[in-house]
Amino acid sequence: MTTPLIEIRQIYKSYGNTPILNNVSLNVNHGEFLTLLGPSGCGKTTLLRLISGFEQPTQGEIFINGQCVNQLPPQKRDVHTVFQSYALFPHLSVFENVAFALRCKKTSNQEIKERVFDALKLVQLELLAERNVKQLSGGQQQRVAIARAIINRPQVLLLDEPLSSLDYRLRKAMQSELKQLQKTLNMTFIFVTHDQEEALSMSDRIVVFNHGHIEQIGTPKAVYETPANLHVAMFIGEANIFDIQVHTVKDQDIVTNIEGIQLSCKNTGNYQVNEWLHLIVRPEDIRVWSLSEVEKTEGMLPGRIVDIIYKGSTVDLKVELSSGKIINASEFFDEDDDKLEYTLHETVWVQWLPGWEVLLPYEG
């Protein structure tokens, strides 16, 4: 069995009487891209600071390469941090910002030159080496911060929401570049974000935080398609949620009632008759049909379209059901497909196929 690079063992962290992290345990593997995901104030950045050594745990232990590092200062740990603010030296050039750590170690000028340009090539900034960092764009400044962090090839790179200040297009480009850089270096990245799309697109595994504890650890596919609880389901992407009661159990299915319509669902949790559950359907799994398209309406819910949002590649629909509940549906847009020419207040039928839903224990 492979020994994890980082082991977080039953970590607690409080500031005064305010608990921040509550019994957090986590292993981080060699060469993986791990994302700590959660809303603001959930403890993810605090955990990053504990790993880096900028904070000390109230209780628990942190191991790097099998060694407990609780008493080691940041400079003795083989980890580097890229901060949200980048923390560059504004009076220095790109080259000198990246070379700073090497000069502190009194590395020879020739070695500094070689290693700095190697790092700048990795982030595609070698042609801007002599430019002052104040003359760079936000994305370029971020690349300088990353080059400076990887100059000594640490085992772990910690990234604290480094993309949050970038515009959408640049943020998307940097997501791809960061993931490619991580693969090229075969370095462990621990990335902090509150952005679900970032986490899903970049990570090998995602750690979902909430109120100082871990809700779920898994691959992007696992946390999206099989959320551990209602918080994860609602935080990772959009979700339509129905509260249902199991009426009957038949073979591998359960039968329930939604909006007065009898529906069958896959019994994924060995649920029993009369048990209350949350039924979750993602917007992209909802199918919307005009009245003229439907002959048999078994297993479908009636509704009317109350909003249409065109997003280029998709059309998002808000459909009001007979109870007044509004659900979201998302369909890929095809300008040549007349079926997607919906009109506001149009009466429609909605459905999803058995097995496309997620069932979770009722949380009240």
UniProtKB/Swiss-Prot annotation:
Protein localization: Cell inner membrane
GO cellular component: ATP-binding cassette (ABC) transporter complex
Catalytic activity: ATP + H2O + polyamine-[polyamine-binding protein]Side 1 = ADP + phosphate + polyamineSide 2 + [polyamine-binding protein]Side 1
Record carries keyword ATP-binding: yes
SUPFAM superfamilies: MOP-like, P-loop containing nucleoside triphosphate hydrolases
SMART domains (alphabetical): AAA
Residue numbers binding ATP: G38, P39, S40, G41, C42, G43, K44, T45
Record text on subunit structure and interactions: The complex is composed of two ATP-binding proteins (PotA), two transmembrane proteins (PotB and PotC) and a solute-binding protein (PotD).
UniProt xrefs under PANTHER family: SPERMIDINE/PUTRESCINE IMPORT ATP-BINDING PROTEIN POTA, SPERMIDINE_PUTRESCINE IMPORT ATP-BINDING PROTEIN POTA
Protein name (database record): Spermidine/putrescine import ATP-binding protein PotA
Species in which this protein is naturally found: Legionella pneumophila (strain Paris)
Gene that this sequence comes from: potA
